[in-house]
């Protein structure tokens, strides 16, 4: 089934000029870029995007990290794109990352893990709509 999912290239990766490498990794794996924009989130936007985590101990540090530098929001499309991209991303936990995944290659820590990806079809729709209008997705 053809799906769309959201990829965020996080501040740790944008600051280290890894945008091109990460996008190449995704395209080489068969995902198509349908929309892309570089964004500087403010506190309110970051809190809104991660609202489901409000109240958790990692929420405030995550928001601070996400507003520390620009991010790149990308809509990816492909066969089973959500699961495919999550496999390419790798685990959040550094000890569980498989070699060759984006996070194994580029992450600095559990929080500074270079990329975000939608975890379900429902999340993908909500997250894509957070950054893109329908006519921005080509």
UniProtKB/Swiss-Prot annotation:
Gene Ontology terms, MF aspect: ATP binding; metal ion binding; nucleoside diphosphate kinase activity
Cofactor(s) needed for function: Mg(2+)
Coiled coil location: none
UniProt-annotated binding residues for ATP: 10, 58, 86, 92, 103, 113
Pfam families according to UniProt: NDK (PF00334)
InterPro entries linked to this entry: NDK-like_dom (IPR034907), NDK-like_dom_sf (IPR036850), Nucleoside_diP_kinase (IPR001564), Nucleoside_diP_kinase_AS (IPR023005)
Active site location: 116 (pros-phosphohistidine intermediate)
Top EC group: transferase
UniProt EC number: 2.7.4.6
Catalytic activity: a 2'-deoxyribonucleoside 5'-diphosphate + ATP = a 2'-deoxyribonucleoside 5'-triphosphate + ADP; a ribonucleoside 5'-diphosphate + ATP = a ribonucleoside 5'-triphosphate + ADP
Subcellular location field: Cytoplasm
Keyword Transferase applies: yes
UniProt keyword Hydrolase, yes or no: no
Cellular-component GO terms for this entry: cytoplasm
Keywords annotated in UniProt: ATP-binding, Cytoplasm, Kinase, Magnesium, Metal-binding, Nucleotide metabolism, Nucleotide-binding, Phosphoprotein, Transferase
GO biological process: one example: GTP biosynthetic process
PANTHER family per the UniProt record, alphabetical: NUCLEOSIDE DIPHOSPHATE KINASE, NUCLEOSIDE DIPHOSPHATE KINASE DDB_G0292928-RELATED
Its job: Major role in the synthesis of nucleoside triphosphates other than ATP. The ATP gamma phosphate is transferred to the NDP beta phosphate via a ping-pong mechanism, using a phosphorylated active-site intermediate.
Similarity annotation: Belongs to the NDK family.
Subunit details: Homotetramer.
Protein name as annotated: Nucleoside diphosphate kinase
